[in-house]
């Protein structure tokens, strides 16, 4: 009888052709998908060309999404995108997404059905951990590893220890997946899951939409984790059936699998949470913020919170209201499809009427790229995932992190606050 394993151990063992892998083991495994963007792929291309192969291992298993500085913000980014475009054409890469059909990579891939439960996914972007929401093992790598994987279809891994998060209860009020992950990071710290797998289970999952789960898995890296992964349930399967025709495999953790820590969290007690500068662990609930923190800019979007559910919540709050005079509110639908759906539902009109500006899908200001860079002394509230020093612009600017509900309400108030201050009771649905 084989030894008990966690979800992550099982997926890694399966892809390495082994019956069992142990935390700390160094393994080579076959990957199902290799991902790169316009920032990381050019470096990978240079390394790939040094290998001396004349083709990629599988043109269907490589995905390249120019999303960080697109539409091209300057000559340098245009050159990088040109290099990536030419590489995709030369090697006939099936899943290269040009500006007209692109989106922020970590929202686009699940939407396109490119990741399914049981997959082993590597991406030259730290937020590749997002796909754990689908019950896949997905993790960020460097451009050199991307190059090697494009040539061989394999990558090396150190099997991580795991932390088990047993969620119970139901979301209440304006609490969302973003608040849950900010609460967890505030609890364990930015190195609380260092090189570990964050594995989510428990009856509380029923209360979490797929968009909530993508948000939670997305920010595993902000706790230092190797990956975040959710137990597959009916919601996962329903999502996969709607978006993909790929075969999938469900890996459930063994009952007696070993974890370095186990946390039980009652999500019904989690309140909307804000991360203060300059780390995602510097959290306070909205009730603990006693002073008025005035802001210059609100950003709603990103690979963390740019999905349709996020936009619906923001629109619900902004409908019939105006963004505070002198404040900038920028909204980024995460993909073209999400943008189109938001148009159909009238959300874009609500945003524009409220005084927001709506951008094409791009990572934009999240990494200090473009479309909303902060000046010296400016302060932003964003639904993004990082608030390090200088993350969104000038080293002397500040970024606070929140959910779309808090961000939208704050855009109206002019300071960090809750929809409750606008007389809106929480959504119990």
Curated annotation (Swiss-Prot):
Pfam (any one): Aconitase
- GO:BP terms for this protein? L-leucine biosynthetic process
State the Gene Ontology terms under molecular function: 3-isopropylmalate dehydratase activity; 4 iron, 4 sulfur cluster binding; metal ion binding
Q: Which of UniProt's keywords are assigned here?
A: 4Fe-4S, Amino-acid biosynthesis, Branched-chain amino acid biosynthesis, Iron, Iron-sulfur, Leucine biosynthesis, Lyase, Metal-binding
Give the cofactors, semicolon-separated. [4Fe-4S] cluster
Quote the record's binding site residues for [4Fe-4S] cluster: 303, 363, 366
Q: What pathway or pathways are given for this protein in its record?
A: Amino-acid biosynthesis; L-leucine biosynthesis; L-leucine from 3-methyl-2-oxobutanoate: step 2/4
| Cofactor descriptive note | Binds 1 [4Fe-4S] cluster per subunit.
Instruction: Please list the reactions this protein catalyses.
Output: (2R,3S)-3-isopropylmalate = (2S)-2-isopropylmalate
The catalytic activity of this protein is classed by the Enzyme Commission as 4.2.1.33
Q: What's the subunit arrangement here?
A: Heterodimer of LeuC and LeuD.
Record's function text: Catalyzes the isomerization between 2-isopropylmalate and 3-isopropylmalate, via the formation of 2-isopropylmaleate.
Q: What PANTHER family does the database record attribute to this sequence?
A: 3-ISOPROPYLMALATE DEHYDRATASE LARGE SUBUNIT 2 (PTHR43822:SF16), HOMOACONITASE, MITOCHONDRIAL-RELATED (PTHR43822)
Q: Which family does it belong to?
A: Belongs to the aconitase/IPM isomerase family. LeuC type 2 subfamily.
Q: What is this protein called?
A: 3-isopropylmalate dehydratase large subunit
């Amino acid at each position: 009888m084989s030894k008990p394993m966690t979800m992550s151990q099982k997926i890694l063992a399966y892809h390495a052709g082994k019956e069992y892998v142990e935390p700390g083991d160094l393994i080579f495994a076959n990957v199902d998908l290799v991902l790169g963007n316009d920032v990381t792929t050019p470096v990978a291309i240079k390394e790939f060309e040094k290998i001396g192969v004349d083709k990629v291992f599988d043109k269907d298993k490589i995905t390249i999404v120019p999303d960080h500085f697109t539409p091209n913000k300057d000559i340098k980014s245009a050159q990088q995108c040109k290099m990536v475009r030419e590489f995709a054409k030369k090697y006939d890469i099936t899943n290269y997404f040009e500006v007209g059909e692109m989106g922020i990579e970590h929202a686009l891939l699940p939407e396109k059905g490119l990741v399914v439960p049981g997959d082993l996914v590597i991406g030259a972007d730290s937020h590749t951990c997002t796909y754990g929401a689908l019950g896949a093992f997905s993790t960020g790598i460097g451009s050199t590893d991307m190059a090697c994987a494009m040539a061989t279809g394999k990558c090396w891994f150190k099997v991580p220890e795991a932390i088990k998060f047993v969620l119970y209860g139901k979301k209440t009020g304006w609490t969302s997946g973003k608040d849950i992950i900010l609460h967890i990071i505030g609890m364990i710290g930015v190195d609380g899951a260092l090189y570990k797998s964050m594995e989510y289970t428990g009856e509380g999952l029923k209360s979490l939409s797929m968009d909530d789960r993508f948000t939670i898995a997305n920010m595993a890296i902000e706790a230092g984790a190797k990956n975040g992964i959710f137990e597959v349930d009916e919601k996962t399967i329903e999502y996969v059936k709607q978006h993909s025709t790929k075969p999938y495999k469900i890996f459930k953790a063994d009952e007696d699998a070993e974890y370095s820590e186990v946390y039980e969290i009652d999500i019904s007690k989690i309140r909307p949470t804000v991360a203060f500068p300059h780390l995602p662990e510097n959290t306070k609930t909205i009730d603990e913020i006693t002073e008025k923190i005035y802001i210059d800019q609100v950003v709603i979007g990103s690979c963390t919170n740019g999905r349709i559910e996020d936009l619906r919540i923001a629109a619900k709050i902004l409908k019939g209201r105006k963004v505070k005079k002198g404040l900038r509110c920028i909204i980024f639908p995460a993909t073209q499809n999400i943008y189109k759906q938001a148009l159909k539902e009238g959300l874009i009109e609500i945003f524009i009427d409220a005084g927001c500006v709506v951008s094409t899908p791009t990572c934009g200001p999240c990494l200090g790229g473009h479309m909303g860079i902060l000046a010296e002394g400016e302060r932003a509230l964003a639904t993004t995932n990082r608030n390090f020093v200088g993350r969104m612009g000038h080293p002397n600017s500040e970024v606070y992190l929140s959910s779309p509900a808090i961000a939208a309400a704050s855009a109206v108030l002019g300071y960090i606050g809750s929809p409750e201050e606008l007389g809106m009771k929480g959504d119990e649905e």
